[in-house]
């Protein structure tokens, strides 16, 4: 019995199949006038960019938009916490990919930047609304 010791070969075969499935799903979404949000969350250097790169490789660039989410800009900070996400919701047939999400405020800003209790509680209420 022969066992392949080359992990790259099977990986590339499987990845090519996944790319095909992603492409088919994007076309179906467009034809059915559906929209989707993909929110990636994770530590810095955890692979979020690699996931976005693989999605980008498979999809027609006219059908999706990637939004890197960092600290809110001055104009964003003047609005409710979720405003910057509301303004980036996809239109029918489109996909929005968020590189970090609304949960980041609860996960990262709370620990790293000392998000005040009142803002933390308000964020939870807004997310669950």
Positions of PLM-derived features:
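Glycine-rich phosphate-binding loop of ATP-dependent small-molecule kinases
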Residues: 1-129
């Amino acid at each position: 019995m022969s066992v392949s010791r080359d992990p790259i070969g099977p990986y590339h075969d499987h990845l090519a199949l996944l790319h095909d499935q992603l492409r088919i799903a994007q076309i179906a979404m467009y034809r059915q006038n559906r929209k989707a949000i993909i929110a990636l969350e994770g530590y810095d250097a955890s692979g979020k960019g690699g996931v976005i790169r693989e999605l980008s490789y498979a999809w027609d660039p006219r059908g999706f938009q990637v939004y890197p989410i960092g600290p809110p800009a001055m104009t964003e900070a003047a609005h409710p916490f979720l405003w910057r996400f509301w303004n980036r919701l996809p239109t029918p047939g489109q996909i929005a990919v968020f590189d970090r999400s609304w949960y980041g405020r609860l996960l990262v800003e709370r620990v790293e930047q000392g998000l005040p209790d009142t803002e933390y509680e308000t964020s939870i209420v807004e997310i669950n609304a």
